Amino acid sequence: VVTQDFIEKNGVADQVSTQGGDFTRNDFPQNCDVAVMASNLPQYNREIINQVVQKAFDALLPGGEMHLIGEMLDDDRKGPMDAAIWGLMEVMSNSTGLAHSRKDCVQYFKQAGFENIEVHEFIPDILVRVTGAKPK
């Protein structure tokens, strides 16, 4: 609802649509240009993230992009602290979550079939963005 209000207020409702749901259970809409998963990465284990990234890949049109934004550990898994703390908090709360590394996230994209996979600083030492494109 909030996203749809924002889209309408900015006059792009004829260009952008959203669909609510539980991305771990519900099917994704088909023929999408872009899929975004943001700021909930540590809440889920590797199996769930693999499934979600694969569902996004399957829903995208050829050339479509996925953007995964979240708290990610460096490849050596020694930091940054925010990503480690989020992962620890998930373990302590008995969720399925854990701290994923940048390397883990790139692997999720590769396994799904994405190409042109890139890792970008989104908010330094807090959020990272991994992007990939579905082959044309």
Model-identified regions with their sequence ranges:
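Alpha-helical subdomain
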Residues: V1-K136
